[in-house]
A protein has these predicted regions:
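N-terminal export/targeting and maturation segments
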Residues: 1-48
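Detector for Asparagine
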Residues: 28, 33, 58-60, 74, ...
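C-terminal partner/receptor-binding element of secreted or periplasmic proteins
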Residues: 82-111
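Short linear sequence elements within intrinsically disordered, low-complexity coil regions
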Residues: 8, 18-19, 29, 70, ...
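Exposed beta-strand-loop-beta-strand "reactive/processing" segments of non-cytosolic proteins
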Residues: 33-69
Length: 111
């Protein structure tokens, strides 16, 4: 029973981080709609509890990234990422965190 609950919590957490990473990548591109899809390949938990999430964009496994969610950010992805050169070239120099993006989107909805 406890294992099932822990697995369910991990699945919910993983899904939430996938949404945050996808939002971050798609919102912070230099040109709109250059990232069509985001795929995730693994979620690892480091000994100190930090999450390491790997994936790639646009169905090209060479356009990969590694995203981090650390205890400093309450284990929520905030933009800490290592990208391949191609992914890095698509992303703006000054990016917004997923939380900042959500605030911007909420403001647009209010209008």
């Amino acid at each position: 029973m406890k294992y099932d609950e822990k697995a369910k919590q991990k699945e919910i957490y993983y899904k939430e981080q996938q949404e945050r990473i996808t939002l971050y990548l798609k919102y912070n591109t230099k040109k709109p709609n250059t990232i069509k899809s985001v795929h995730f390949t693994s979620l690892e938990q480091e000994p100190m509890g930090d999450a390491v999430i790997e994936g790639y964009i646009n169905n090209n496994k060479e356009d990969e990234f590694v995203a981090f969610a650390s205890s400093e950010d309450n284990f929520q992805f905030q933009g800490d990422m290592i990208e391949s050169k191609k992914v890095s070239n698509l992303i703006k120099y000054q990016t917004k965190t997923p939380d900042e993006i959500k605030k911007d989107l909420d403001k647009k909805k209010e209008r």
